[in-house]
Structures are given as structure tokens and as C-alpha cells.
Amino acid sequence: MSKRAVLEVIALGVEDAVAAQAGGADRLELVTDMAADGLSPSAATVAGIRRAVDISLRVMIRLADGFAAGDVERLVRVAGELREAGAEEFVLGFLDAGGFVDLAAVERVVGVLDGCPWTFHRAIDRAADRDALRKQLDGVPAFELAGVEAKELNIFG
């Protein structure tokens, strides 16, 4: 197993993706609307990027600014469309009104990902109780944080 850090770059479209790969990116995180901390790209965008580059892609599943799941059925539809467009890895994370993991939403969305790897995205940064979140998500292989090391939060035990 390589100890080399993975360079992940945000891509909003095909041009970004091609430039990132040419610049040495190992992996892309595909999003739209960075002003909202990244939302789901369209299935057409994912398919276009998948055709244009040959590095790993992680695709955002989030429909609105903030970390509330919102319309879970729509999230499930979008996740399925992204999967059909060639997405094989995902980032997602939903909190309820109290700032705790919205497990029902997470489980519904993950249920349509056909076993694809996924990362609990930056919702942890806004969680009311990070220790409780970690326990709720026991077994999740990866968390993505903004500005804080995972070891500082004792995410992994």
C-alpha cells in the first residue's frame, strides 16, 4: 500500500477535469455550485467527465445549500442517475434539524449506490456532537472534513 498522499481536485466540468488530470490530480470530486459548498452535478456532466479523463471520480450527492437532506426521494433519483452516468464513488452527508446524522436519508441514498464506495462528506463539520456522529456512522470507511484533521476529532477511535 502506497503512503503517497492522494491529490484530489474539485472539478465543475469537463474543462476542469481535463486540466486537473493534466496537472497531476489522482482523483476528482465532481460538484457544481461552489458557493453552496458543492452540489450534485448533472448526470450529463458526470458522463462527459467520465469520457474525458481516466482518473478516479467521486461525485457529490447534495441538492441544496446546507446539510439537510431535503427531498429524499429526489436524492435517491439523482443518485441513481449519477450511477447510471458512470459514477462509481460518491461523497454525501446529511444532518437532521438537531445537527445529528440523518441516518434514514443516508441509508436510503446509499441503498441505491450498488455497493459503490462513499465518503461521509463535510456535514461532520456542522454536526452538533461529533462523537455521537462517529458512533452513528461506525463502519463508514472515510470522512471528509474542512480545516480540521480527523485525528483531532478522534473520528477513527
Language-model segments: residues:
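Active-site-adjacent beta->alpha loops and helix N-cap segments on the catalytic face
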Residues: 15, 34-55, 69-76, 94-114, ...
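N-terminal beta1-alpha1 ligand-phosphate binding loop
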Residues: 6-19, 23-24, 29-30, 37-38
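N-terminal small/glycine-rich loop or linker at the start of catalytic domains
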Residues: 1-4, 49-67, 115-116
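Conserved, mostly hydrophobic/aromatic
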Residues: 20, 49, 82, 109, ...
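Glycine-enriched alpha-helix->loop->beta-strand junction motifs that scaffold or abut catalytic
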Residues: 21-28, 53-56, 86-89, 112-116, ...
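Catalytic cores of alpha/beta
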Residues: 12-23, 59, 63-84, 125-141, ...
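Hydrophobic faces of well-ordered beta-strands that scaffold small-molecule active sites
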Residues: 5-11, 28-30, 57-63, 90-92, ...
